[in-house]
Amino acid sequence: MKSVIVGTAGHIDHGKTLLVKALTGIDADRLEEEKRRGITIDIGFAHLDLPAPNGEMLRLGFVDVPGHERFVRNMLAGIGGIDMVVLVIAADEGIKPQTREHFDICRLLSVRRGMTVLTKSDAVSPEMLEVVRLEVAEFVRGSFLDLSQIDPGKTDSARAPIVAASSLTGQGLDEVKAALGKIASEVPAKNAAALPRLPVDRVFTMKGFGTVVTGTLVAGTIRKEDELELFPSGKRVRVRGVQVHGSAAEKAVAGQRTALNLTGVSMEELARGMTLATVNTFRSTSRVDARLSLLASAKALKDGARVHFHAYTMETIAEVRLYGAKQIRPGEDAFAQLRLAEPGLLLPGDRFIVRQFSPVVTIGGGMVLDSAPPARKRRIEDTVAFLKVVMDSSPVESLAARVARRGAAGLALDQIPGEMNLRRDEVEQLVRGSTLVRCGTVLVSPRAFADASGRVIETVTKFHAANPLVAGMSKEELRDQVRLGAEVFSGILSKAVEEKKLEVSGELVRLPGRGVVMKDEEAESKKVIEQVFRAAGLKVPALKEVLAGLKVDRVRAQKIMTLLLRDKVLIKVSEELVFHQNALAELRQKLLALKATTPKIDVARFKELTGVSRKYAIPLLEYLDRERVTRRVGDERVIL
């Protein structure tokens, strides 16, 4: 059965709750004070099953909202997730202040379907009823409640779905139900496969059940035993039971009035304005970039002004920071960042309402475009260009823009579902249809990838020019200089090697075919150093004396030493001792030959075998331990 959420709207005492009761048989006023005072204070709920014109059964969930100006904030908490609205206007009073404000709110929230009901029609004459009907038709002309906007060919009498009814006598109620069924049948079904999200509008406890929350499920499906995340706290909860329109169910799907029995959280930890959603996906935010519209009846809104911010059941104070403007004039739109006093779960496409800080009246609303704006300031022109793209483009183009604005840092795949409100399989599909570069689990724009690749190659080229005696640049040093993340850096290196723009040897990166380039005196000095150490055997020469006798300066001599050590021609045993590789190889052979007759050796025997002093013997034995030629056992070494 298709579920459609219907919201009421209208001035106080125009008969919204009585109309809902007459249609459904359910009194949506649940509070004792509401019944005593005869007015709706908080949002109430009812439901009705109706046949659509094609015979399909529809379940209408009514959200009845208060009409008093003092309770508009409660009205906003209920109307955020509706599919269609019933604008209620009393025939004996006509259009009143909250009629206008509620109607403005519906338009700002981009409600696209609904009807108008003239209640208390039995209290006026037929002539007066016709006058009110004409007044209302003019009031809604050009809006979503004017059917001429859908079918300009309709006659004047059929342009606006305005039905006169009396909740007391029952007159017109059948026409109201017929119109509701027709309009509800045209409401597109919400996406039950999307990521689930339930804005909480009521919290209470039930004896024998525990903590219960209710709300309109705006997307996805929630089942018994599901684990959900509570925003903005991030606390994990489990669904012990599900009710849909007051009846137990195995699951709730998008578009249904839903009650959840929760475990893992107390009633004190829950409140209206919080949101339950899928785990490990979303993040709460205190800043959103949006397209903000100001009502024609509002005063100009200045940059930096504070407003009351309402989205679904959430309410907080926000500071408006306009992009490239000092104010928004009445009836105009602008891009803005809304800085919220309290964090909440907001996603691209969410509609919101702003009300003047004081006096508190509705002045505008808009749509969230980006709920994860960068912490670092960007040029206003760049931000506006980005917001225009995500507002008007396809999901693939929106993803490309979100990746591009992060430059070479890229965007991690696991961040995209929360930032764009997409399932992971939908993200994978978008990536396949894009030109984005994938570096492990990070996406980078082709331009940023090319620019970063150019920086890497340029950095290696400059390193070679400054260090002709060094065979290559270490990966760690290179990544540090170009300031790239590990996965993007690895992706760039792999691509550069594939295209033969770089070579990688172990931990060294170099230009293709680039070896050590030596001048004649440098090559001669290298040969001298190697010969001196080879001739010395285990009796290491004084390094200072060796370097002092060369034809090159000390800096180049040290680079030559580094090259010999890197190529393992010379081997550093300790900070002070360097040996030729041949000397150490001969020492290994001596120890292996000794093993047949003497499997163990102490320091004294080692000194006798090698002819070196204790100063050299200890570091050499420790080196042999590290190389697993010997193993120390007490004061002796076992030859392995």
Predicted regions and their residues:
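Conserved nucleotide-binding/hydrolysis micro-motifs of P-loop NTPases
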Residues: 68-69, 92-96, 120-125, 167-171, ...
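Conserved Switch II/interswitch segment of TRAFAC-class P-loop GTPases
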Residues: 58-60, 65-70, 79-131, 546
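Residue-level recognition of beta-strand microenvironments
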Residues: 11, 203, 220, 242, ...
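Conserved G1/Walker A P-loop phosphate-binding module
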Residues: 1-65
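Residue-level signature of catalytic and energy-coupling elements of molecular machines
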Residues: 13, 19, 38, 62-64, ...
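Conserved catalytic-core segments of large NTP-driven translation/proteostasis enzymes
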Residues: 121, 138-299
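C-terminal effector modules of nucleic-acid-centric enzymes and ribosome-associated factors
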Residues: 124-128, 138, 265-572, 580-631, ...
